[in-house]
Amino acid sequence: FDSHISDWILWLPTTKGFFSPRNVKDVHSYGVELKANVDVRLGRQWALRLDANYSYTPSINVGEPISAADRSVGKQLPYVPRHSASLTGVVSWRGWAFSYMWCHYSERYTMSSNDLSLTGRLPKYYMSNISLEKSLQLRWTELSFKCLVNNIFDEEYLSVLSRPMPGINFELFVGITPKW
């Protein structure tokens, strides 16, 4: 893809703890997004699904400097990773599904100048999640119960500067899909 965007609204954190919009006059966002998947039947009741995704997304400020001190022109937008990838594997059997998901996010800048100081960038990180799901087919509905364990290796990471994300955490879901 190759996009030229006018008036890109960039939400950046402030020193007061909230996000504030900032207008970036002109942005050139380009790159490649790749996706692949494979479905394999392993006998009558077993199935395996593999999904892979990769994105290369430079997003560059190509507008005019807003002041003499503006060093953001020609630089990657803050908090936008250049590279991201994910791999997911799902094994299914008799209404049960076990999945493993691995994600990667490249280094992200926290300042529009792409300053390489300690606070000017967030390091790359890798994330792993697992889930177990059971689906039940009833005459009038489909019920599903799902348990997720996110960040199973307790990776320390930041999505926004000075705001650590949770370590290992859990989610439970119940789904009801009526059959009308």
Label each PLM-derived region with a short phrase:
Residues 14, 43, 123:
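Acidic surface patches and DE-rich sequence motifs
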Residues 48-51, 75-180:
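Conserved C-terminal beta-signal and adjacent last beta-strands/turns
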Residues 1-4, 20-109:
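Gram-negative outer-membrane beta-barrel transporters
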Residues 10-18, 64-70, 107-114, 150-156:
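Flexible, solvent-exposed coil segments and beta strand-coil junctions
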